[in-house]
Amino acid sequence: VNMMKAGDGNYYEMRNNAISDMLEPGSTFKTASIMVALEDGKITPHTEVDTGNGIMMMHGRPMKDHNWHRGGYGKIDVTRILEVSSNIGVSYLIDKHYSDNPQKFVDGLKRIGIDRPLHLQIAGEGKPNIRGPKERYFAKTTLPWMSIGYETQVPPLNILTFYNAIANNGTMVRPKFVKAAVKDGEVVRDFPTEVINPKICSDNTLTQIREILRKVVAEGLAKPAGSKQFAVAGKTGTAQISQGAAGYKAGRVNYLVSFCGYFPAEAPKYSC
């Protein structure tokens, strides 16, 4: 239920936030960035990055890890980078391997299909906005910040569709709200499963990503999303909400906090 307060003081269901909100996804987007780099052969799960004391200057702008005030994470590998959701780790790798050709990274995201319209059965769908280097305001800092889920807008359901594809052996399917239309006990119309992208990445990359996401919940920051009854895989997300033209520094600081994943991790049945 998405209830919003109207001018008359009453609350109404005006919009569906899950399909229409165009917010920066934050750290749930890091999985897509790492998937692109793995698929392109730029990194492995064991590739290391020295994140130092938690603050790294990138093109004149400080990139910070959430624990920078405690001294940072030092040298960690790709698996650990996602486990602790290191901004420096992800952004450094993407900037290192794609700064000379940002379009290749953008093409990798589009190859996954995370930007594709879902053509949902309900109205109000937002359109993902993933900018390319030829577009206006694509600066040197855009690539590293895009890699950690900023400077790009993707509706929550599109992010869930991506994680569902990881759970679904790499096949991205269109979210479905109606399975069939029934009249007088008889099915008058079926709504079959529709494939958006038959393969978001290679089997090898998919296996690596699934193992990393399992460890994110088992050993990383997503432990609270775990369960004693079954294994959960997924990724946490925290994004500072932009205050429009004022950017991220004006007034009160608000954050979008999320988790996206699936369970049981070894044989997924549900995405969340």
Where are these regions (language model features)?
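Beta-lactam-recognizing serine transpeptidase/beta-lactamase-like catalytic domain environment
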Residues: 1-26, 32-271
